[in-house]
Regions:
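Charged, low-complexity interaction regions
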Residues: 22-29
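Contiguous, non-catalytic segments that form substrate-binding/exosite surfaces or channel walls
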Residues: 30-155, 333, 337, 348-357
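C-terminal, non-catalytic "cap/extension" segments appended to globular domains
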Residues: 47-69, 83-85, 256-360
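Inter-helical turn/loop segments and adjacent helix faces that build the functional surface
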Residues: 61-68, 180-189, 208-222, 248-253, ...
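Short pre-active-site segment immediately N-terminal to the catalytic Zn-binding motif
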Residues: 151-169
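Catalytic glutamate of the conserved HExxH
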Residues: 168, 172-176, 180
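Post-HExxH zinc-binding segment in Zn-dependent metallohydrolases
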Residues: 182, 189-231, 293, 334
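Long, amphipathic alpha-helical stalk/connector segments used for oligomerization, subunit docking
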Residues: 211-282
Length: 360
């Protein structure tokens, strides 16, 4: 594949280490360290935390829910989980025809509709050698990541044959963009469940943009919408439901108690087909960050379908202003009805899927 830019992986990694040495350890997000960078970018391995015992994992989940989420958030999550488990989402046969040579161009083009700071962040990341793009044969647990170092994050994007990495690139660049606007608020003490808000909303808007500008086909548009729903809700909703229930218990239950709970849930929902090992794959904090941010993102999107600039502006303002005392009033002020908006989003997705199948 021909590209305008030649990605010198070793040079980028050296530059990362050089930049890393300029900052105090406290300025770097705890979960990103030198060994992570080696695993991610040199050995090209991504492993989850399955080596942790399930009790430690569940204790971490419980601590997060007790200390880092508000009662308002807990109630929102509980209501949304119930609805999402009942709401049937239809999926079309996936079509991946996106021309990856257009990835940078289409990303620049979309970001220019957001504002010049977002567009400049992508340009600077390329110029400063902070962007690392590589091909990947198999889909693992992530398609991209942002290594947040002060205001100059590093980005790693994986290109797959079964995905649109332009959406991934936009998602990660918007993390760097929002870090600049909020002084890395969500890596400090901000409400952590909002950390993915602008990034996920940008994915939805960019998918619309690519389709309206005939950069992707109708089938690709539906595939992207399906993938967004899968990644943030439907693929993980059962494990989120279980972990959420476990986090509310006074003590971490024994394995046999959890097995029994899984079996009870499976009677009503056959998608409860995971083993206890799945409980340690990803912490509840990470799963809820995507779920909760997506809930709010869809609420903003449904209110500003034809005005991506206003929608993203609203999301940015919420991320700037939100704290545990203001979030209820903020969502009310912007007229965000989470469950109603998600229901509309899914209904529209289902209609498009039926249209693609020729059923309507």
């Amino acid at each position: 594949m021909q590209r305008k830019f030649k990605w010198n992986n070793i040079e980028i990694i050296k530059n990362y280490f050089k930049t890393l040495s300029k900052y105090d350890e406290d300025s770097i997000i705890d979960s990103i360290n030198l060994s992570d960078m080696i695993l991610f970018s040199i050995l090209k391995i991504y492993e989850t935390s399955e080596i942790q015992s399930y009790k430690k994992s569940l204790e971490f989940d419980k601590t997060f829910m007790d200390q880092n989420t508000s009662d308002f958030e807990k109630n929102k999550i509980e209501d949304f989980i119930k609805m999402a488990l009942d709401k049937k989402v239809r999926f079309a046969k996936p079509v991946y025809d996106f021309d990856e040579t257009k990835m940078l161009g289409s990303t620049f083009s979309f970001l220019s509709t957001v504002d010049n700071i977002a567009e400049k962040e992508l340009s600077d990341a390329i110029f400063d050698k902070r962007l690392y793009i590589r091909n990947a044969k198999l889909l693992r647990n992530y398609t991209g990541t942002t290594y947040s170092i002060s205001h100059n994050p590093y980005y790693e994007i994986l290109q797959y044959s079964n995905g649109n990495s332009s959406l991934t690139l936009t998602h990660e660049i918007m993390h760097g963009y929002i870090n600049k606007l909020t002084d890395r608020k969500f890596y400090k003490d901000g409400p952590r469940l909002y950390i993915e808000l602008v990034s996920l909303l940008s994915e939805i808007y960019q998918n619309d943009y690519l389709y309206k500008n005939q950069i992707i086909s109708f089938e690709e548009y539906i595939t992207n919408t399906n993938d967004i729903l899968l990644a943030n809700v439907t693929e993980e909703i059962e494990i989120i439901d279980l972990l959420f229930k476990l986090s509310k218990l006074e003590n971490v239950p024994e394995k046999n108690e959890i097995d029994n709970l899984i079996k009870k849930c499976a009677i009503k929902n056959p998608n409860y087909n995971f083993t206890i090992k799945k409980l340690t794959c990803r912490p509840l904090e990470s799963l809820l960050a995507y779920l909760y941010s997506f809930m709010i993102a869809v609420g903003i999107y449904e209110n500003n379908k034809d005005n991506s600039k206003e929608g993203i502006k609203t999301a940015i303002q919420i991320m700037k202003d939100v704290d545990f005392d203001s979030e209820k009033d903020l969502l009310c002020y912007y007229g965000i009805n989470v469950n109603e908006s998600y229901s509309k989003f899914v209904d529209e997705n289902n209609l498009l899927v039926e249209k693609a199948k020729g059923s309507i």
